[in-house]
Swiss-Prot record:
Ca(2+) 2 binds at D90, D92, D94, A96, E101. GO terms for molecular function: calcium ion binding. This is Parvalbumin beta 3. It comes from Merluccius bilinearis (Silver hake). Residues 38-73, 77-108 form the EF-hand domain. GO terms for cellular component: cytoplasm. Is regarded as an important allergen. The modification N-acetylalanine is found at A1. In muscle, parvalbumin is thought to be involved in relaxation after contraction. It binds two calcium ions. It comes from the Eukaryota.
Length: 108
């Protein structure tokens, strides 16, 4: 799903680092997976991969399954992780993360 944007080895390392429940940290994940160093264009491409229902927003249910977008066998985020991730990214308080909010979150 992220071919041409992210390296498989980086994805594997990032997923391994947050295997344990409640160990997910979006800043560490985006850095490890190599997304925070990418261009605005690549970050936008990644957003549209994560936006599974193509609504133009990443909603809470998509955040919960965020890691599975990177690898089908990855775990779901816990409710606490999901809520913290949403709170960090949802700067306008509409309950979802838009493409611009996502770009800010990745570069945070």
């Amino acid at each position: 799903a992220f071919s041409g944007i992210l390296a498989d080895a980086d994805i594997a390392a990032a997923l391994k680092a947050c295997e344990a429940a409640d160990s997910f940290n979006y800043k560490a994940f985006f850095a490890k997976v190599g997304l925070s160093a990418k261009s605005a264009e690549d970050i936008k491409k990644a957003f549209f991969v994560i936006d599974q229902d193509k609504s133009g927003f990443i909603e809470e249910d998509e955040l919960k399954l965020f890691l599975q977008v990177f690898s089908a066998g990855a775990r779901a985020l816990t409710d606490a992780e999901t809520k913290a991730f949403l709170k960090a990214g949802d700067s306008d308080g509409d309950g979802a993360i838009g493409v611009d909010e996502f770009a800010v979150l990745v570069k945070a």
